[in-house]
Regions:
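A short beta-strand-loop-beta hairpin characteristic of the jelly-roll/cupin
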Residues: 52-84
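Short metal-coordination and nucleic-acid-contact micro-motifs, chiefly zinc-binding Cys/His arrays
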Residues: 115-120, 151-154
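Conserved metal-binding segment of the jelly-roll/cupin
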Residues: 80-100
């Protein structure tokens, strides 16, 4: 049986980080019902899509460096390092790209709420594909969204310029296992 971070009132982020399984686990680490709820991740690979949420979120970087890329009008890129706090506005697509290992706590509302995984063309910037979902355990929906994107060349082909993109890289991401564990605990 694999261990994972437990929900508790106090938290040693760095000790709990050692219990994470892969990038973007987003394990809830506060007692159920705490809102906003802190979710812990240790990220080593670029997020495979832009995440769009219906609610505002806050991202706290505890260790490592990276960047948050926004698909706003200016295509803003925000560099993050230890101690940085980034505001992630609702309905603005954002993607985390670590430079090495990046430990982060995401403060988000309690699910379920609507989220979406979105992919944009590297050539022209057009939206290529978007999957919207509402789930108590969004990690399972993330996994299914990437699996669908990777299995359909049409979803990876830009409707504006015709450029076909490679499959989304998952690296050490294990959202399917995280979802199974969280569903098994009622988290």
């Amino acid at each position: 049986v694999r261990e994972f971070p437990e929900r508790r009132k106090t938290l040693n982020v760095f000790r709990e980080t050692a219990r994470l399984w892969g990038s973007y686990d987003d394990f809830p680490v506060a007692p159920a019902g705490v809102d906003p709820s802190p979710h812990l991740s240790r990220n080593q690979v670029p997020q495979p899509f832009y995440l769009v949420t219906a609610r505002d979120e806050v991202l706290v970087t505890m260790a490592g460096t990276g960047e948050v890329r926004f698909r706003d009008q200016g295509c803003t890129v925000l560099a993050v390092g230890p101690g940085d706090v980034a505001y992630l506005p609702a309905r603005i697509p954002a993607r985390i790209v670590p430079h090495g290992e990046l430990v982060q706590v995401r403060l988000k509302g309690n699910p379920p709420f609507t989220e979406a995984a979105a992919w944009y063309c590297d050539n022209c910037g057009a939206l290529m594909h978007r999957v919207e979902f509402t789930s108590d355990v969004p990690q399972g929906a993330y996994w299914e969204a990437v699996a669908g994107y990777n299995s359909q060349a049409g979803q990876r082909t830009c409707p504006a310029c015709g450029h076909e993109h490679d499959q989304a890289e998952l690296g050490d991401i294990v959202w399917n296992a995280v979802a199974d564990a969280l569903e098994g605990t009622g988290a």
